[in-house]
C-alpha cells in the first residue's frame, strides 16, 4: 500500500536517511505484492497511480542525489500519472525496470526516454526473460537491462545468459570471487565453497 500524500513526505525522508546511513545508491519501488488496502490505517491511502507517483515524487524531493527506480508492473509506472505538482516524471523517476517479457523502453511515459528504461529483464532462477540481447538494446536506445536473482549454484547459467554483455560494455563479464549464502554475512570463496 502506498502512503497518503501527507505521510509520503515523512516516508520519503525516512528512506533518504536509510540511503544515507547505509550509503545506498537509491531505492526501487515494486508494488507487485501490495496488500489489501486498510481504510482504518490513517497512514495509507487507497492504492492508485496518483498515490504511487506522489510517493516517487516525494522520495526524489527528499533525496535528489539518489536513484528512484520503479518496477513497471502495476501502479508504480503509469501513463495516468506523469506529472506531480507541475513536475514531470523524468524529474522524479530515474530508472524504469520492466517485468519479464515487457519492454517499457518501447513506449516510455511522459517525458521519459528509452534511456531511462530497461529494454530487457531476466529472472535467473526460473530462467525467464531469455538471454541478454545487447545489440538489440543498443539499436533501440534502451539505457538498462535487469537481471534478477542470480544464485551462486546457478552462476554458470547466469554467465551464459549474460555472455552478450561484451556487446554492451566491450569486455566480458568477470566471474565473482566471493559470494554470500542466504541469511549469512560470511564471505565465501567462489566456486570453492559452493558445497
Give residue spans per PLM region.
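Structural recognition of the beta-strand scaffold that forms the well-ordered cores
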Residues: 25-30, 67-71, 94-99, 117-120, ...
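Short, small-residue-biased leader/transition segments that mark boundaries at the very start
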Residues: 2-4
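Generic structural signal for well-ordered alpha-helices
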Residues: 12-19, 49-60, 134-135, 159-166
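Active-site-proximal loop/turn and secondary-structure-junction residues that shape catalytic pockets
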Residues: 33-35, 72-76, 102, 151
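Active-site groove signature of glycoside hydrolases
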Residues: 12-46, 146
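Short, acidic/polar
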Residues: 6-20, 76-89, 126-138
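Aromatic-lined carbohydrate-recognition surfaces of secreted/lumenal glycan-active proteins
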Residues: 49-83, 93, 97-98, 121-124
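Substrate-binding cleft of secreted/luminal carbohydrate-active enzymes
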Residues: 99-107, 119-195
Amino acid at each position: 500500500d502506498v502512503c497518503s500524500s501527507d505521510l509520503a513526505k515523512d516516508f520519503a525522508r525516512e528512506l533518504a536517511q536509510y540511503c544515507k546511513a547505509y550509503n545506498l545508491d537509491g531505492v526501487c519501488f515494486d508494488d507487485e505484492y501490495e496488500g489489501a488496502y486498510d481504510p482504518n490505517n490513517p497512514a495509507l491511502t487507497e492504492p492508485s497511480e496518483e498515490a504511487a507517483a506522489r510517493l516517487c515524487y516525494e522520495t526524489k524531493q527528499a533525496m535528489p542525489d539518489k536513484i528512484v527506480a520503479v518496477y513497471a508492473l502495476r501502479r508504480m509506472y503509469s501513463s495516468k500519472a506523469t506529472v506531480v505538482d507541475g513536475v514531470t516524471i523524468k524529474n522524479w523517476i530515474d530508472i524504469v525496470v520492466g517485468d519479464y517479457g515487457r519492454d517499457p523502453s518501447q513506449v516510455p511515459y511522459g517525458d521519459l526516454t528509452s534511456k531511462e528504461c530497461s529494454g530487457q529483464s531476466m529472472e535467473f532462477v526460473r530462467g525467464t526473460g531469455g538471454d541478454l540481447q545487447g545489440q538489440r538494446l543498443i539499436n533501440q536506445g534502451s539505457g538498462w537491462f535487469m537481471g534478477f536473482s542470480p544464485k551462486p549454484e546457478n552462476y554458470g547459467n547466469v554467465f551464459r545468459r549474460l555472455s552478450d554483455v561484451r556487446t554492451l560494455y566491450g569486455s566480458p563479464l568477470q566471474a565473482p570471487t566471493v559470494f554470500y549464502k542466504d541469511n549469512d554475512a560470511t564471505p565465501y570463496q567462489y566456486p570453492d565453497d559452493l558445497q
